[in-house]
Design a protein with these regions (language model features):
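Hydrophobic side chains within alpha-helical segments
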Residues: 7, 59, 64-67, 114
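Residues at secondary-structure transition points
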Residues: 48-52, 56, 87, 134
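Short amphipathic alpha-helical surface micro-motifs
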Residues: 5-7, 15-20, 57-60, 101-106, ...
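Short, well-ordered amphipathic alpha-helical segments that serve as non-catalytic structural scaffolds
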Residues: 53-65, 95-99
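Glycine-rich anion-binding loops of enzyme active sites
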Residues: 37, 71-145
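Extreme N-terminal cap/leader segments of soluble proteins
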Residues: 1-49, 68, 73, 77, ...
Length: 145
């Protein structure tokens, strides 16, 4: 893990509980997870289409919350895109919207800006879940989630 572990240690003393690829928000009793995909790091437009890119972004977050026992309900989407890829960006956003609706996830906000490469970051927030009902990787069994 290296630097990822070091970064997590810096923030792990905050009021929320960080672990297993998502955090637990004590005050609202919700799980939250975020993932980012970057063009030419996580995918290349020559090999992945708009539907595959949208699927990768959503599923990486969805599985983090679901495997912890939660149900993703809300999302915040941040998109950075090159001006010459406007149509492709809109197509990816349409695919994200379709898949989100299929999974009962409401995109409630986010941000857009221009950049040299396409970058998308999605944060998903779960329904309420009691702390005692969270499934931890260390104690998970087949059929838990």
């Amino acid at each position: 893990m290296g630097i990822e572990s070091d970064v997590i240690k810096i923030f792990s003393k905050n009021s929320s509980i960080i672990g297993d690829d998502c955090a637990y928000l004590r005050k609202t009793k919700q799980l939250i997870s975020t993932d980012t995909i970057v063009e030419n790091i996580h995918f290349n437009f020559r090999y992945f289409n708009d539907k595959q890119i949208a699927h990768r972004l959503i599923v990486s977050n969805y599985s983090d919350i679901q495997s912890s026992g939660g149900t993703p309900r809300f999302g915040l989407l941040n998109i950075s895109f090159p001006k010459n890829k406007k149509e492709l960006t809109l197509s990816i956003c349409n695919q994200i919207n379709l898949l989100s609706k299929k999974l009962n996830i409401e995109i409630i906000g986010g941000d857009t800006c221009s950049s040299e490469n396409f970058v998308a970051s999605l944060t998903l927030i779960s329904d309420k879940i009691d702390y005692k009902d969270i499934i931890r990787r260390s104690s998970a069994k087949n059929g838990d989630s």
